[in-house]
Amino acid sequence: MVTVISLGGSIVAPDKVDEDFLKNFLSLMREFLEKDEKRRFILVIGGGSPARIWQQAYRNICPKAVNEQADWIGIMATRLNAQLVRAIMGDWCVQDLVIDPTKVEPFIGRVLVASGWKPGFSTDHDAVLLAERFKADYVINLSNIEQVYTDDPKKNSEAKPIDKISWQDFLKLTGEEWIPGKNVPFDPVASRHAAKIGLKVICAAGKNLDNLRKILLGESFLGTIIS
């Protein structure tokens, strides 16, 4: 069984590296890997605070900032975070960091760690491509929000949480264009590809590891299912 987890950079490095979270996340991964020899994880790591800070600095310095350059800055931040996650996985992860989801060697270990790829492709999109490549049933997208809402709850107090939504309706909420650093629950370009291949995505709060355990066990959980 291959499970793809897209781990938002805001969870790994909200302002600095969250060491306590990573220790607890490693413990949870170890729990499932030791319990089930057939269980394998693909972890796709986002850029978090380093990506946003360096991208904003670029835009502040260059009024005519080019999206492609901002994207490359974010990609390098994902690679730094992903290399850290790969290192802490130790012997569970025997393969090099995946930087191109279209050129992945056969999955020979128990954990595979991936980072950003190239401009125009978010780590969400990488997660979808890897799920397609290794025939995962779904992607678990962990970020700093518990669920997808009808609107931004920080700006609209009447925004309602959504338990389940179709890809078509989800794209109406987010728009269909990818902009580097855009703050949406799941990248619109990745969403279109997921819809095309019939992939389910579960959006949930990354810090709530008890909730992640429930998702992995197939139990009732707090989050949003997009399919």
Question: What are the functions of these language-model segments?
Answer:
Residues M1-S227:
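C-terminal catalytic "cap/lid" subdomain
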